[in-house]
Amino acid sequence: MIVRSFSAHILSDARFETYIPARASRSTASSRRRQSSRSIASSSSQTPRSSFEPLARVRTRADARVRAEDHAAGVFARDDGRPRVRGLARVRVARVEAHVDVERAIVSRGGRARSHISTPTSRDRETARSDERNNRRGSRRARAGARSAMLDAGARRLGRCHNALVTALLTDTYQLTMAYAYWRNGTHDRRAVFELFFRANPFQGEFTVFAGLEEALRFVSNFEFTERDVEYLKSTPVGENMEDEFFEFLLGLDASEVRVYAQKEGSVVFPRVPLLRLEGPLATVQLLETTLLCLVNYASLLATNAARHRLVAGQNAMLLEFGLRRAQGVDGGVSASRYAYLGGFDATSNVEAGRQFGIPIKGTHAHSYVQSHAGWGCVKNPKLVAADGSVCEDFPALVLEKMKSLEAIRDDMEVDLRWSETNTSELAAFTSYALAFPNAFLALVDTYNVLQSGLPNFCAVALALRELGYAAVGIRLDSGDLSYLSKRSRAFLRNIERLLGTKIADNLSAVSITASNDIHEEVLYSLRQHGHEIDAFGIGTHLVTCLKQPALGCVYKLVEVDGTPRIKLSEDIGKVTIPGCKNGYRLFSQTGEAIVDVMTRVGEPVPKVGERMLCRHPFMESKRAYVVPSKVAPLFDLVWDGARGVDPQVDLSLETSRARCKESIRQLRADHLR
């Protein structure tokens, strides 16, 4: 039993043995083929020579004709000599059996079989090519039919990934070269276990938020190589060295024999404890590596970054994701919006992300909107329908009236809050925007001068809207000293409300103040230390680019083959892997706080509530402690079960993952919230 603690790194009492990777043995399939050949030779020893020789020669031709079908369809010899079909690819079985019947018929006819062995003509070659094309079409139809049958049987499959670029070819070249080498060596079907994990928490923190599971399952659910994929691979220098039968093998490949165990999306996770555990044929699970890392690495890093911003900002502040324009590419922008929302942000400015994932969208206007107004002549439609249905024929005139009332009390305000003259073009811009959005008027007040122009102009428009039954939303600050400006802005609004009275300016001092000036964790800490009056933060660059740490560093390591643990050794102790197929559990204290994550070998006893256990770090012998858990929660769920698809009990909705993230962080001890 081996454990990974949250911060003390205390881990369990039963040791893993260290295994040196053994030489790859010949595959079970190869062994069965040898047994099959011996059985044929044995049975043929009683056959007249004239009968046996044609059988051997015709069998060679038959093997060549069906080999491609065997690899594409997943057909292999059984101990009894009959074909064995694996996974969803149950194709061409009747055709293979027909070849067996032909061979038996040839044996019975004796020497007549020689007439079937001749030099191939061009017509023969064309026929062979036609047969190959038909076989491919038949294989694809059979796979599609099998998948449909799986769905009809109640299995749950997900749609394709939201990014169309996520295909089987979204991988590194060496995944394909390894898959070919496995296939060429006959070891591609060995049962392997891989684990996806990371070695250190990001941002020098003490926790990580797991994200990207839904996209990972979408990829696994639809994993396949298309004919177009294969044609491209054949055209590459790497593919030129590969046999055609291997490409047929790829065309028949899917995740029907793969099982995926995972921690829950949105949960807090820790180093070394697997996020995903994949079990399946060696070549298949190897081919999944790069894509899964791509889907999980950035998602988890971004969700963690968002959660850290939420912790610093506090639970009451509104967090708005504004990072699309600074994101690293289109998918980086959309993914950032999605996983920022999962990590605790409230809304995004990204409209496409809102459409795809149901995230609330928010936004106001830019400086360019204010700059585009050169005066009152830019306000073309002055009419505004009031909240009660009456019509204000000249809303700009009402705004100017309110500005005069503000100027009348200007000298009664605190000295440093008095203004001299506002920018008329800015006032016209605010007025036209309020005409368009009377229910959602939030003004960017720092185009010219926050205290001398922006705030007085905002108040004039807000007071005019109030008279017509509308309530202004607030202001946005996008430059300057945010702590100072937010506090002076709140003081300005309170002065106006006090001097005009609640009848005219009720709740004006309570409008929202939003800040959006290159904000990141350190800025939020500084604002909290110096005090501020900000209600909402718009955060972009530092959130979506994860400027403080650009990558999480997830890895995908082989830990077991055919039931035998495998280990990766290194002079760098941090890169030594923990061998064997493992389960994980989270132990909780009596107060409901998470204490430690425990890893055990599959098949070992599950930790029990109330039973003392020694927990020990996997690499640091001195880090150990006894733990008596009040609650034990399994970490891994079987989320993908081959032909059965995605477990119906797995809730992959974004809202569920978001709520889980919040609850999981709430359960952490204070020393982990760093």
Positions of the model-derived regions?
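Catalytic cores of alpha/beta
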Residues: 519-532
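Hydrophobic alpha-helical signal/anchor motif
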Residues: 6-9, 16-19, 35, 58, ...
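Low-acidity, Ser/Thr- and Arg-rich intrinsically disordered low-complexity segments
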Residues: 2-7, 12-18, 23-51, 118, ...
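Glycine-rich phosphate-binding active-site loops on the catalytic face of alpha/beta enzymes
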Residues: 533-551
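Glycine-rich beta-to-alpha transition loops that act as phosphate-gripper elements at the mouths
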Residues: 263, 325-327, 513-521, 540-542
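Ordered alpha/beta subdomains of enzyme catalytic regions
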Residues: 150-439, 452, 464-467, 471, ...
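Catalytic beta/alpha-barrel core
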Residues: 444-447, 473-481, 512-516, 527, ...
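Compositionally biased, intrinsically disordered low-complexity segments enriched in Pro/Arg/Gln/His
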Residues: 38, 46-48, 55-61, 67, ...
